[in-house]
A protein has these predicted regions:
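Outer-membrane beta-barrel channels and translocator barrels
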Residues: 65-67, 110-114, 162-164
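Outer-membrane beta-barrel architecture
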Residues: 59, 104-106, 154-158, 219
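Predominantly the C-terminal beta-signal and adjacent terminal strand-loop region
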Residues: 163-224
Length: 224
């Protein structure tokens, strides 16, 4: 009987180690839906055109123990678009840049041989900038949006399911507490053959609040 129990425990441990990461393992995963797919409550603090910190999320984890992982999150979203008209002749170029960074810890529970549920906490910060350049026969105007900065923390709940050794699919939800501040806007107009004139706003703003959000929708990841 004792031998049978020991054999069962050994097989179970081998099955878990075949799929799940152990102490010293490194994982990385990528968001399949960067802005979430189940959002019912959007963050009251937007970062650029994105709510919360969901811009192009990539996450890495280092397992300090079999069930404790240090996590690092990085979000990037850069875009540029140009519109042209012929009557009158104008060209408008819009650019935006969003960057986010997070650092936290996860505690993983036993689950099953393939399923790894976890809870965690994370601190994050981010920034967003944007501008528009408009060119016509009369003048060139460059307008810079007010830069936005956000910082805060998350309480996290998620699960990873290992579809094959060292390959997993997962989902993660989070309760966010965040604060954002907004800088000044500016606009520079240069008439054709003239001198540039710059106007800058004098005011700044800030906001904060709670939001519930499936931060990264589904994700796919790998264990190294």
């Amino acid at each position: 009987m004792t031998v049978a129990l020991a054999a069962t425990a050994l097989v179970s441990a081998q099955a878990q180690s075949e799929f799940k990461p152990l102490a010293g393992s490194v994982t990385t995963d990528f968001s399949l839906f960067a802005n979430g797919i189940f959002n019912q409550t959007e963050s009251p603090v937007a970062l650029g055109s994105h709510a919360g910190i969901n811009a192009g999320l990539i996450k890495g984890r280092y397992f300090l123990q079999d069930n404790i992982a240090l996590r690092l999150s990085l979000g990037l979203n850069n875009s540029s678009s140009t519109q042209k008209t012929t009557d009158p002749v104008t060209e408008a170029t819009t650019k935006s840049n969003v960057f986010t960074f997070g650092l936290g810890l996860e505690h993983h529970f036993g689950g099953t041989d393939r399923l790894s549920p976890y809870i965690g906490a994370e601190l994050f910060l981010g920034s967003a900038t944007g501008s528009m350049k408009s060119v016509n026969s009369a003048a060139t105007t460059i307008s810079k949006n007010a830069p936005r900065f956000v910082f805060g923390g998350d309480l996290l709940l998620g699960a990873d399911y290992y579809v094959a050794p060292h390959v997993y699919l997962g989902v993660e939800a989070g309760l966010e507490l965040l604060h954002a501040s907004t800088g000044k806007t500016s606009s520079t107009t240069t008439p054709a053959g003239g001198t540039a004139t710059t106007n800058e706003s004098k005011s700044t703003a800030s906001a904060g609040g709670f939001a519930t959000d499936v931060k990264a929708g589904f994700k796919v990841g790998f264990v190294f």
